[in-house]
């Protein structure tokens, strides 16, 4: 993305995220999957927008994130990037690499990361996993593509876990998570998402790493926070985990608006003369 001109705030980069951690400034990230929402988020001041494979759940209605493909992620990413470019161009845009787009081999990972970056002007990709994907992370960053890691609860591994419960509650798994975080940082990641792990552990990881940690259900000691936009706006009425704070109840607002529209159409009070040509 190009740098904004005039009085607009500078575009958030990997360097700026590192600076924010060093200064103790919290990083605010939200998901978006379309042009309109991306415009709203960018002008509202978020630091980063994640084009999440959670689109599989909230956009397409699947029960897991696994069905998303590289081409589907690119479709959503293009829309989000256009939305950001239409506004302040401030927010960093990060795109999830979907299931099986990087797990087969480092070569496959590089190829798919390159495709995602080449087909639109996003800023980085995100990958789930620790030591097992370290070589892929290194290879991708070596060719100039920034990578955000993801540890703790990893939705692409849901069938391995068997549930969405809190991860790293036991000492052995907590030690492994710390080790994986160090490995992913050493492989070149510029930040790591920590999902649904104990707050104390997230704080420990955040202090150990020089790169920012972005928490989702990981407590207040992370360097930043991320939520799925549909959850925090109250659009996902059948899903409300403990870590989600709802800032609006848009489901009810939309439902009432649609009911009013239907009533106006059926009563022939819409459109009026002022709304006609």
Swiss-Prot record:
CDD domains according to UniProt: KPHMT-like
GO biological process, one term: pantothenate biosynthetic process
Catalytic activity annotation: 3-methyl-2-oxobutanoate + (6R)-5,10-methylene-5,6,7,8-tetrahydrofolate + H2O = 2-dehydropantoate + (6S)-5,6,7,8-tetrahydrofolate
One GO location term (cellular component): cytoplasm
Compartments where found: Cytoplasm
Pathway: Cofactor biosynthesis; (R)-pantothenate biosynthesis; (R)-pantoate from 3-methyl-2-oxobutanoate: step 1/2
A family per Pfam: Pantoate_transf
Class in the EC hierarchy, top level: transferase
Note accompanying the cofactor annotation: Binds 1 Mg(2+) ion per subunit.
Binding site for 3-methyl-2-oxobutanoate: 53-54, 96, 126
Principal subcellular localisation of the protein: cytoplasm
Function: Catalyzes the reversible reaction in which hydroxymethyl group from 5,10-methylenetetrahydrofolate is transferred onto alpha-ketoisovalerate to form ketopantoate.
Subunit annotation: Homodecamer; pentamer of dimers.
Protein name from the UniProt record: 3-methyl-2-oxobutanoate hydroxymethyltransferase
Organism of this sequence: Chlorobaculum tepidum (strain ATCC 49652 / DSM 12025 / NBRC 103806 / TLS)
Chain's gene name: panB
């Amino acid at each position: 993305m190009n740098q904004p001109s005039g009085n607009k705030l500078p575009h958030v980069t990997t360097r700026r995220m590192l600076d924010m951690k060093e200064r103790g400034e919290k990083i605010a990230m939200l998901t978006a999957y379309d042009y309109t929402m991306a415009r709203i988020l960018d002008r509202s001041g978020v630091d980063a927008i994640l084009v999440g494979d959670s689109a599989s759940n909230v956009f397409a209605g699947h029960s897991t994130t696994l069905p998303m493909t590289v081409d589907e992620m690119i479709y959503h990413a293009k829309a989000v990037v256009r939305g950001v470019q239409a506004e302040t161009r401030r927010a960093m845009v990060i795109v999830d690499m979907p299931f099986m787009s990087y797990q087969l081999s480092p070569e496959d990972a590089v190829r798919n990361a390159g495709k995602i970056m080449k087909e639109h002007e996003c800023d980085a990709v995100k990958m789930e996993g620790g030591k097992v994907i370290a070589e892929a992370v290194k290879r991708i960053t070596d060719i100039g593509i920034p990578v955000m890691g993801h540890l703790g609860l990893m939705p692409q591994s849901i069938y391995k876990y068997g549930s969405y419960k809190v991860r790293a509650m036991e000492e052995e798994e907590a030690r492994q998570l710390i080790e994986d975080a160090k490995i992913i940082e050493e492989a070149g990641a510029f930040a790591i998402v920590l999902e649904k792990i104990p707050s104390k552990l997230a704080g420990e990881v955040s202090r150990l790493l020089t790169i920012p940690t972005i928490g989702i259900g990981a407590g207040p000691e992370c360097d930043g926070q991320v939520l799925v936009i549909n959850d925090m706006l109250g659009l996902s009425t059948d899903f409300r985990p403990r870590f989600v704070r709802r800032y609006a109840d848009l489901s009810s607002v939309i439902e009432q608006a649609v009911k009013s529209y239907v009533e106006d159409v059926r009563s022939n009070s819409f459109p009026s003369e002022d709304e006609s040509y």
